[in-house]
Amino acid sequence: MIGWRYLTGAFFFLLVGAIAKPISAQTYQGRELVKAQLIADTDAIAAGKTFTAGLLLRMAPHWHTYWKFSGDAGLPSEIKWTLPSGWKAGEIQWPIPLRLKDPGDIETYGYENEVLLMQQITPPASLADSSFTLSADASWLVCERLCIPGSAKLQLELPIAVQTGPANEIRGRR
């Protein structure tokens, strides 16, 4: 049932992604190819409490990015976090990819439409500020008939609190 657990987590992040801003867009010849955005599964950061953050990439129709093992061609997307001392980022949790055919019958593995690359983030045991800005440099290779490298410097500001809740919790619901 790991598939359902992953899909449930991905759905949760997609709901959160509708709220999170800002979004960075990659354009080529006036056409928007990829929208990149950082999202998190929490409404606040608590000292020492691990949470999940992710890079959401939304590709234009017929364009794709690559999995960590891309196959005969391609490069995987990367996330380089800028975290202060004491913060830790886990490994990227790669969703199961699609098998794709690139021009020349080259077999690759990747993602069409959108992909969420999640990572566990652990803050230190004590936090002094009232908020924290997660910063990441993201890079990817997006392809259709040709491949174009893309990148973005992304940020997501979250408050620091003693207690946290899910980012998509509906408040005041009866």
Language model features by range: what are they?
Residues 8-18:
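Bacterial N-terminal signal peptides
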Residues 1-4:
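N-terminal secretory signal peptides that target proteins for export/translocation
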Residues 22-174:
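Extracellular/lumen-exposed scaffold segments
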